[in-house]
Amino acid sequence: KQVHNPKVLPLSMIFQDPMTSLNPLRTVGFHLREVLRRFQPKLTKEEREVAILEMLNKVGISNPELRLKQFPFEFSGGMRQRIMIAMALLTKPDMLIADEPTTALDVTIQAQILALLKELQEQLGLTVVIVSHDFSVIAGICDQVYVMRNGLVLEHAPVDTIFAQSLHPYTQSLLKAARLEASQGPVPADRDDSQLV
């Protein structure tokens, strides 16, 4: 019961693949209403609808009244990610954790999602933690970077320092591989145990 109490756990998470996080047999409206029923049970039905419509507008979903009646498969990948962001923010978290929030999105949609996260962070005063292997995402949105391997923090510094003067050999090897990949295409590397936040 405590897991659903925002006073106990004031954070929310956006998972990597919104299609697997959303029930394909339920409408988007059902998903959003369920979040409010669990996290803000004192709201009336009318107050829930107003909060949902406002949040959908805030995350850039046009025609929210119509969209509430649609199913996840009727949305593009970028729009599903916006729905996940709306669901996460309806819990009124202090911290938002986004696990690879731009995976499988084209470059234009990636930029839109990152800009949205940055804008919401500033508007709502959120702490946003981005878990990513993508150095362009890290460079574009992060202030601080934690380089992790096997669950251990190997290096922590401001983003500019990580890119210009990283100290740990593992960080340096990740950056070197990313530069090589950017210039020559994908480089085979075992990155399953590495995380950049």
Could you say what each language-model-derived stretch is?
Residues 1-12, 30, 38, 161-166:
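ABC ATPase NBD coupling module
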Residues 32, 85, 96, 109, ...:
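Hydrophobic anchor residue at the start of the ABC signature
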Residues 111-124:
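Helical segment within the ABC ATPase nucleotide-binding domain
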Residues 138-140:
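A short, surface-exposed alpha-helical micro-motif characterized by mixed small hydrophobic
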